[in-house]
Amino acid sequence: MSRVAKAPVVIPAGVEVKLDGQVISIKGKNGELTRTLNNAVEVKHADNTLTFAPREGFADGWAQAGTSRALLNAMVIGVTEGFTKKLQLVGVGYRAAVKGNAVSLALGFSHPVEHALPAGITAECPTQTEIVLKGADKQLIGQVAADLRAYRRPEPYKGKGVRYADEVVRTKEAKKK
């Protein structure tokens, strides 16, 4: 049995929840998020809580219920507080700038890298070597951050590249003659 699924999700004031079969919509001050739930999970909306239970006939019911509870809890946090992800650019001449709905990166290539941001994600650059991504969808924020990091991952000898703000890059020792 999933211990995660047994804990209900508390819905704070100012958040609307619509449950239509297996499709759930959560609306708050930061926008609206919609997700289709697994058929193995039964969700009940009562008072200001969402409770989860597995349906009969599904072997992975409790596991899916725990996953669904974690995803919906992230949706509630996203529409109330939002999520942020910080990236750092380490390297000589590595710079970032926000141009409209895109992030422009100078990463040592012969051309600047332009990355369009999806709807619901905003970016800002407090300095030329920092990018702060903000949005309500936790999965989408992580995917955009991973896409930006993939342009120039931190290399293991000097640590140059795009890294998460809390990432520790393990560096190797240079080859000795």
UniProtKB/Swiss-Prot annotation:
GO CC terms, sorted: cytosolic large ribosomal subunit
This protein's record includes keyword rRNA-binding: yes
Organism: Erwinia tasmaniensis (strain DSM 17950 / CFBP 7177 / CIP 109463 / NCPPB 4357 / Et1/99)
Keyword Ribonucleoprotein assigned: yes
InterPro entries the UniProt entry points to: Ribosomal_uL6-like, Ribosomal_uL6-like_a/b-dom_sf, Ribosomal_uL6_a/b-dom, Ribosomal_uL6_bac-type, Ribosomal_uL6_CS
Any Gene Ontology biological process: cytoplasmic translation
Protein name as it appears in the record: Large ribosomal subunit protein uL6
Protein task: This protein binds to the 23S rRNA, and is important in its secondary structure. It is located near the subunit interface in the base of the L7/L12 stalk, and near the tRNA binding site of the peptidyltransferase center.
Entries under Gene3D superfamilies matching the protein: Ribosomal protein L6, alpha-beta domain
Keyword terms, alphabetized: Ribonucleoprotein, Ribosomal protein, RNA-binding, rRNA-binding
Quaternary structure, from the entry: Part of the 50S ribosomal subunit.
Positions of transmembrane segments: none
Family annotation (NCBIfam families): L6_bact
